[in-house]
Structure formats: structure tokens, C-alpha cells
């Protein structure tokens, strides 16, 4: 009796075998069979499960190293078998970000920028700040041939003036409050202390100011829905009295620091992240091309680094774990992890 087996027609009794690798595939979305690989790479957030869905994405995220090579091989196990739908990669080497602190015109700390990725390769990211083409600042961020440019970065939040019965009035702004003052016969009174936590948008703040007799505020541009908390350029107590039309002698409250932070953290720029320093009064000063520094690929990997990665995988829906290590202590930790997850953790796992 003849039979077809593994693409061959067998006509005589014989022993035949084939490699069956279908078990490594996600057969359907409802069937969990996902591989997690732990190893060293030159890109990616450390000690964090990274869900990857293609070789191209893996190369973009992991950059290089044994972890990338293993993921590439897992996505393309053979020319005859399609790869899995997803692979979870965990970078075991505790790399650090590169960073730089931007200063304001008074040499005070203004914005802290850090590389979005981790590793020594990010020390070649550089940033430049110059005057905007028509207003504000022009910020350029570059790594290799990739350049992102944000131009005319300036932001007016709201305009306020006083036209009441008092002799004069003033406004002060900090990260958590807007304070209104009035002065009559040389006696100053605090009219209102507006807690930004209670008025979290620019429109909320403007409405609250307008509730005080003699004070008038208007939102500038499309900023009404933006957050007011720790985003306003701080301002010391400043006179905002204007009792003559067209009432242009008041004060404009700005966010020239925050607008740069928002641009850096948006999808318009993908190399660095930014954080505004507390109590800033203005945006950053101009800066010639300057590099970020401090990024490393981390110290030598230890057993605790692997156990940290295994801990992070406890909440992930994976069924197979491959640690790229020949260390017996690492494999002992993986064995303990699989035993725990397959019983107490109620997520059956195997390692190889």
C-alpha cells in the first residue's frame, strides 16, 4: 500500500520522520501559544515585556544584540512554516537613557530631555534651540540622518486686565496658583487665590478670574481645553491695571516652556522625551547643537536581572520562555518561575 508522507510517496515499508513546528504558532487568537525571549539587546526599554509583531518592528525596537537575533529566528523558523503572530522580548541588560538639561536665559534649569530609547547609542542624539522663524523658538533634534524640527513654538494661554474701582491690581502665577491682588489708598488686598487643582483647564481659570469684579480675562487661541496645572510660565506679582480702551495694558500669561515640552512629547518628534522643571518663568535659552550624554548599555548582566524579567512576565499571557543564557542559576530561576506560574499563577508555562 502506498502513502504520501511529508511530501514523499512511500511504496515500501520504511521508517520516516518529519519536523513538526506547528506547535510554536498562534493557531488562532483564542489559543494562547506565545513565546517570550529574555536576552541582551542594544535597544528597547529594559526589564519590560515588549510585544513585537514582525521582524521589521523587532529590528526597529531592539536595534541589535542576541535578543534581536533570537527574535528574528523565531519569526522565521523555516521557509515552509509561517512565524508566530507575536513574540514577547524582554531586554535583560539594565541600560540607561541619555539626557541633557536645557537652561533658561538666567542659566536656571528649564527642561530635562531624555532619549526615548535606552543605551549608549543614544549619546549621539543632539538638540539645537534657536529663534523661531516668526515667533517663539525653533527646536531641532537629530540622530544620524533623522531630524525633527519644531518651528514657531510659542504659546499665549490667556490675557487679563483690571478695570475696576481699586487704584490698581496685579496678578501672580506659580505652578499651583493664580493670585489676584488689588490696591486702594496704598493698601493691598488679596482678591483671590485660584487653586489650579480646582480649575484644571485654561478656560476654567479664565472663568474664575472673570468672576472677580473688575478683572477681565480672555483665552488666547485654541488653548481653552489645555491643562493649567504646572504648565503656566510663572510670573511674579505684576501690575495688570488698564482702565483705558482698548485695554491692551494688561498681562498675557504664557506657556512658552510647556509648548516645547508638548512638541517634544508628541508624535511629531520620536527621539527624546521632555519634562518641564518646576517653577519655570520662561522657555529655554537658545542653544547651539549639543549632545545628550549618560546613556549606557548597563553593567554586566546578573541573575537578579533575569529574575526581575521573570517577575515582569508573571502578568503577561505567554506560554513559552527562552532565556538566552547558559548559566545554570538562570535556568534554575526559570524552572522555579514555570513551576510557580503553572500552579499558583494559573498560567501554564514551559521553558527551553
Label the model's feature ranges.
Residues 1-352:
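Surface-exposed assembly/interface segments
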